[in-house]
Amino acid sequence: SLVFNNLLLVLVIIFTPEIRHALESVGRSSVSKFNFFGFRSGAEEKRREEMQKMVNAVCRASSDMSDKHIGALMVFEQETILGDIISSGTVIDAKVSPEMIGNIFYPGAPLHDGAAVFRDGRICAAGCILPLTPNHDISSELGTRHRASIGMSEQSDAVIVVVSEETGAISVAYKGRL
């Protein structure tokens, strides 16, 4: 899906600034305005631009929270609908921005201990409770956020971005792997 592809791009962007620069250059070139069969539709181009804005916002927020050792748990819905997870939190339906993400996870904020769920390029809900992995072979050094990210990725096709409060490390869980 388009969201999954863009979230994979998040990983590359977060961990490799040189690749980010190259991708931004390609995105600005006129070549990106065409696809194999001709022009992209205006709606497709607008959606791609919106997804790119979301990716950039998540990257900036993740980097800022990492620098400040602020823990975060962000779930990006794919094909599996996460209705039960969303209903465990507070529905907010907010535009994605680094400031909004930072406010959600700011220590002491009402929703900071749960996960934020992203759907269709928006923050759908926050303060959501995720299932913990039942796997006992996971390192004892991993905290609850990481165990929840793995548990969520075992039960759905969601991509989960975790920022460690302890180390500031940014991790991604997908298909049961961190």
Regions of interest found by a model, annotated:
Residues 1-5:
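Membrane-water interface of transmembrane alpha-helices in multipass transporters/channels
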Residues 10, 15-178:
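Divalent-cation
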